[in-house]
Design a protein with these regions (language model features):
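A short alpha-helical cap/connector motif
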Residues: 1-117, 121-182
């Protein structure tokens, strides 16, 4: 998936994309159902392309859908994406791709996942809970990716777990990929 393909997919949802006024590498999105509402996704186009490649050929769980930008990127090459976010706006305004299903809570989702992307609440306790839930659903060779590692509670929560391997992409944005310790 190229950045242009991601932009085209997002535009296909009816969402308007504009450069974010305070960060040229970021985007601001406008809901087609609520033109007065401006939302910002911190998932950059470059991160979206990387997420798309990372998810390729896997069953994916996304914890924290937000505006659905990362969901679109994950779904582009994933076998199937299950996404968790209680956002009413997401449920009412976002038309998910055919290989995406949205759930109310992690406990409702059946099966295991080869890739889990966590970008939910950003306080320490919530991130730890998301990690614990993810580890219960992760396949033996699975990987977990985190967004917003620049936030101190997110970094502290990720650091509090024992990972087999960890790869950070500070030049790509705020993504960190972790593999479960064997």
């Amino acid at each position: 998936m190229t950045a242009q393909q991601l932009v085209d997919a997002i535009l296909g949802l009816g969402v308007t994309i504009q450069p974010h006024p305070s960060n040229e590498q970021d985007c601001q999105y406008q809901s087609p159902d609520d033109p007065g509402r401006q939302d910002r996704s911190s998932v950059t186009l470059q991160e979206g392309v990387l997420l798309s490649e990372w998810a390729s050929g896997h069953r994916v769980m996304e914890i924290g859908t937000g505006l659905g930008v990362s969901t679109v990127a994950l779904a582009h090459h994933a076998d199937f994406v299950h996404t968790i976010d209680p956002s009413e706006w997401v449920r009412s305004a976002l038309t998910m791709p055919q290989n995406v299903r949205q759930w109310a809570s992690v406990e409702d989702v059946p099966g295991t996942f080869g890739r889990i992307f966590i970008d939910g609440l950003h306080d320490f306790a919530s991130v730890c809970k998301d990690i614990e839930s993810a580890l219960l659903m992760l396949s033996p060779e699975g990987q977990v990716a985190f967004h917003d590692m620049c936030q101190s509670d997110v970094r502290a929560a990720v650091d509090s777990f024992d990972w087999k391997d960890r790869i950070e992409y500070p030049t790509v944005g705020l993504l960190t990929f972790c593999m479960v310790k064997a």
